[in-house]
Amino acid sequence: MKRFIPMGCVLALALSLAACAGSRDEITQEFLPDTGPTTTSVSTTITTSSTPITAPVDPIAEIGELASRVAEIRELPLDLPPIETRSAQEVLDGYQALTGLSLTGDDRFDAEFLQMVGVLEDDGAVADLLSVCSIPGYYDPATGTLVLREGLIELTPLGQKNLFEELTAAATDTAHDWWGTMQSLSAAGDADAAAALSGLVRGDAVFHAGQYVESQLTPTDRFAITLEQISCDQQRSNPPGYVAELEAFGPEIGRAFVEDLISTGGVSAVDAAYRTPPQSTEQIYHPARYPADRPVAVDPQALTVTGFTEVGAGVFGELQLRALLSDGILSSQALQAASGWGGDSYRLLWDGTDLVLVLRYEGDEARDARELAETLGGWASASMNVGSGRPDNTGLAFEGQEYAFVAHNEVAMLLVLSSDARAGRDIRDEFWPDW
C-alpha cells in the first residue's frame, strides 16, 4: 500500500514556526502590501561576517544576509533557495498542509483516529487542531523553495529568527538530503525513524537560530522576540496534550538532542548524525541511547478476519506513545510508561464504518510491558467511550460504544483500540488464545 509521511514526522519538523509577524515598528502590524513579482529566483554567494545585519530596503537582500549568517553559524554552504511568494492565506494553508496531523494521508481516517482516542471532538476537523499565527514564510523541502508571504516589506526580530531556522533546514537538506531520507523511511513504513530524523532537523535549526539571536541581535530585538511570542501565544488556542507533545518534539526534545551532540563532538557530530540518522524517537528523547540502542523489529501478526482494509501501518514509537498518553492520566505516569520502549508495529484497519488500531509492542524489560499495559488501561477508561475493564483471557477488555483491549506477556504487549465495540472484538479475537 502507499505510505505517507506520518503524523508527528513533518509536524515535529515545522510547528515551531508558528509565530506572529509584522513590522519592526509595531509588532502586531500586518506586512504592508507590495506590487512586486510573485516568483523570484535568487542565487546568493555566501560570505562570512561578524558585522550586524543592517536594514536593507529590499527584503530579499535581508533574507540573503540571513543566509550568510546561516552559512557562518551553522558552518555549511548555502545558496539562497528559489523564492516563491504567495498570499498570506496560501502561506498558512501550505504550511499547515506540510505540518498536518496525518497517519494515513486521508482526512477521514485521520479524523476517525483522533476522535477515537479522545483528541478531536466528534464533529471536529483535523485542521482545527493546528493553530498558527501569521508567518513570514517557510522552507518547503518537497520543492526546495523558500515560500514567502506576499507584500513582505521587512522582518521583525522574530521573523528573522523564524526564517533563520527555515534557512538552516534548507542548508542541512542541501548538504545531507534529509527530505529524501525521510521519504524513504516513510515509504518503508518506519514512521518513527522518520519522526526521529525530523526531530534532528528541527532541533538543529532551533539550536543554531538561538546562537544567531544571542550573537547577532540587540537586547532590544531579543526583548521584541519575547513580546511577539507572547502575542502569538495569546492568539492561539491551547492545543490538546497530544498535539502539544508533537509540537514540542522538535524545538525542545530535538534541540536537547543536538545540544548533547555538540557538547561531545561539536557541529561535526551533528553533521555525522545526518549520515547515521537516529533510528527511533526513543533515541531523541534519550540521547545516551544513540546510536547503539537500536529498536527491536516487531512483526505484525497476520490477520484472517475479512471485511477490513489496512489504511495505515508502521512503527508507532515512543513519540506517539507519549502523545497518546498525554491526556487522561498523570504526566509522570505517562512518562514512566512510555520510556521503556524497545520496538513495536502498528496497523490501522477500516471496515467501511469504523477504525481499529492494533499495536504490538516489545519493552526493554518485562516490567516495561507491564507498566505500559496498566497505564494504557487507565488511559482508555479516562479517554475513550468505554466502561470499566473486565478480565479477558490474558488481559483486560474495556467495552462501551468504543472498545479497548490490552494485555502483556513477558516483554510483549498487545493493544487493540476501536471506534466500535463489535469491530474491536472481531479484531481482538484474531489473537485468541495466545492473548
Residue ranges, per PLM feature:
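Pan-zinc metallopeptidase signature
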Residues: 68-69, 238-353
